[in-house]
């Protein structure tokens, strides 16, 4: 896919800046840099120092302005891709995304999540358009640690459980189609996720199905449904946990997965969802198979110390939180109760 994309890239840009982060992807980004140089492009590069944060965004924007770059090529994980999209839009130049793992669908979503430089979630920003080019090359994805695939599976699974409860009654054909895509996506991941995580890359349809589901199909849900296909408690709890978790120790989807289990428990407790417990047990089996955390404690946080439980509840229930997209009322007491019970019990499967 990368080699085939070069003619399209050279039509779009003559002086790109390659944006990345982390030593793990240095070699890949150097290869990308050299390939573009061989196309007679005037290429520069810059590395993020933190997450998708205003400090990094401002610094990279200055680099682009000083170099007169005419595009951003964001090559990396979700926060690199989000940074590239945000920077490109703010400078009114095109963005090209090159995901280097299957941990996220950020490669083509018109959205950037903004964090502090210490990894605390601030807000999400809706962008005017999707990236101009998305290059999803299986050879790049294969170089990523298997942990990133597990994280991507957890994040993609949340699409169904969040959008179906927040948007199922919206009388809009595109929204309903997006919800059904998320249902098929969930089913695909439940079937193939474990096989993809444990299997080989070559001659493994489950691996291909899974990485494309996480990196491509998951992006269709928001792309078709738009802002009406809402996130809900899984991401609201993720955002709250980032306020107190050790920075950069856990991946986005690893935290979202815990939030998803808690959302289902909330549905059972507050909305009398009879199927929620069965869904938890089904997800729990897959998450254990993927070596994903299933409690906040496994994220390195004791919720019963340092007012952590209250901090999570406060941020989860703040004004304009995604938690309020649920079709039933949730308050801080509910969050405290469900997390307390969940952390103390052992899920029986």
Task: Label each residue range with its predicted role.
Residues 89-181:
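A glycine/threonine-rich phosphate-anchoring loop and its flanking beta-alpha core
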Residues 273-349:
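C-terminal charged capping/lid subdomain of soluble metabolic enzymes
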Residues 171-289:
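Active-site segments that bind and position negatively charged phosphate/pyrophosphate groups
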Residues 2-5, 25-29, 79-85, 104-108, ...:
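Short glycine/serine/threonine-rich phosphate/pyrophosphate-binding segments
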Residues 1, 20-22, 77, 98-101, ...:
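Fold-independent oxyanion-binding glycine-rich loops
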Residues 1-71, 296:
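ATP/NTP phosphate-donor binding region
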Residues 64-87, 91-102:
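A short, small-residue-rich loop immediately preceding and capping a beta-strand
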């Amino acid at each position: 896919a990368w080699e085939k994309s070069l003619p399209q890239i050279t039509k779009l840009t003559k002086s790109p800046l390659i944006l990345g982060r982390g030593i793990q992807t240095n070699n890949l980004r150097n290869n990308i840099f050299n390939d573009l140089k061989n196309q007679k492009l005037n290429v520069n590069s810059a590395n993020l120092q933190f997450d998708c944060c205003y400090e990094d965004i401002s610094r990279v924007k200055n680099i682009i302005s000083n170099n007169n770059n005419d595009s951003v090529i964001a090559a990396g994980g979700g926060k690199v891709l989000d940074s590239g999209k945000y920077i490109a839009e703010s400078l009114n130049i095109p963005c090209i995304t090159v995901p280097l793992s299957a941990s996220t669908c950020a490669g083509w979503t018109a959205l950037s999540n903004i964090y502090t430089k210490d990894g605390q979630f601030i807000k999400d920003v809706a962008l005017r358009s999707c990236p101009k080019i998305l290059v999803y090359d299986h050879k790049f994805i294969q170089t990523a640690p298997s942990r990133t695939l597990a994280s991507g599976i957890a994040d993609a699974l949340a699409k169904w459980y969040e959008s179906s409860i927040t948007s199922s009654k919206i009388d809009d054909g595109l929204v309903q189609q997006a919800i059904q895509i998320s249902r098929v996506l969930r089913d695909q991941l439940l079937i193939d996720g474990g096989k993809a995580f444990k299997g080989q890359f070559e001659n493994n349809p489950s691996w291909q199905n899974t990485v494309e589901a996480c990196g491509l199909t998951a992006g269709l849900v928001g792309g078709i449904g738009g802002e009406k296909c809402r996130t809900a408690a899984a991401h609201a709890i993720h955002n709250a946990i980032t306020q107190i978790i050790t920075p950069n120790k856990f991946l986005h989807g690893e935290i979202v997965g815990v939030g998803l289990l808690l959302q289902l428990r909330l549905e059972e407790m507050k909305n009398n969802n009879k199927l929620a417990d069965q869904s938890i047990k089904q997800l729990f089996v897959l998450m254990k198979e993927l070596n994903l955390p299933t409690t906040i404690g496994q994220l390195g946080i004791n919720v019963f110390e340092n007012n952590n439980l209250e901090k999570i509840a406060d941020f989860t229930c703040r004004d304009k939180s995604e938690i309020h997209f649920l079709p039933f009322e949730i308050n801080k007491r509910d969050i405290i109760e469900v997390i307390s019970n969940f952390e103390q019990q052992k899920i029986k499967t």
